[in-house]
């Protein structure tokens, strides 16, 4: 609310805050077209609101509008200096085959290292980008840097292991893929589609 009041004034800011709450509610329930309708007017009313730009970028990303999503998330980055949406922005560039920009974002994120979760997501996107360009070895090497046994794996560990197992399978290294899918299943049998992936590797 404070942010919206700062960019639109107290009265208008309160109205905008209610509208962005509606858009957030729709987004969280995967009603992306509804969220998009609400956000169109918000972008016009509060173009310098980071919260509006961020949510609009995320909605556009979820609906596969990569160029528009990248534009919004770049604006969010300019307004805040935040690394929060670097992985999503990088994945948008990856979808657009703007691989150099995706790699630059990964390097920024890696050097800043704002949080383990963000760096993990950025690493997954960067590895995927390298794989998309035919560099499976480079993609695998990048994710192997995060391959260490932990007593209580968190979601970020499982996501990186899954991405790496998928790359092993694509590279034809089925024993390593199987081992890593088994490690994920041991930590969380319901994670992703790990059961069906293991069945397909028998």
Over which residues does each language-model region extend?
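Alpha-helical segment of the N-proximal tetratricopeptide repeat
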Residues: 9-48, 54-55, 61
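TPR alpha-solenoid repeat register
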Residues: 52, 85-86, 160, 194
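TPR/TPR-like (Sel1-like) alpha-helical repeat modules
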Residues: 79-82, 111-112, 141-148, 169, ...
């Amino acid at each position: 609310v404070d942010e919206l009041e700062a960019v639109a004034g107290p009265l208008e800011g309160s109205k905008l805050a209610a509208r962005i709450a509606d858009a957030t509610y729709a987004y969280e329930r995967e009603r992306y077209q509804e969220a998009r309708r609400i956000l169109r007017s918000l972008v016009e009313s509060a173009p310098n609101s980071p919260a509006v730009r961020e949510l609009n970028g995320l909605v556009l990303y979820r609906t596969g509008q990569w160029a528009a999503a990248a534009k919004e998330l770049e604006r969010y980055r300019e307004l805040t200096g935040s690394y929060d949406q670097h992985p999503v922005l990088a994945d948008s560039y990856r979808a657009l085959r703007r691989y150099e920009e995706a790699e630059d974002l990964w390097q920024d994120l890696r050097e800043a290292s704002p949080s383990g979760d963000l760096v993990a997501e950025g690493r997954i996107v960067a590895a995927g980008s390298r794989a998309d360009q035919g560099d499976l070895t480079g993609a695998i090497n990048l994710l192997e840097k995060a391959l260490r046994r932990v007593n209580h794996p968190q979601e970020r560990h499982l996501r990186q292991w899954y991405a790496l197992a998928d790359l092993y399978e694509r590279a034809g290294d089925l024993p390593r893929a199987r081992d890593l899918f088994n490690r994920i299943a041991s930590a969380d049998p319901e994670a992703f589609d790990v059961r069906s992936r293991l069945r397909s590797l028998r």
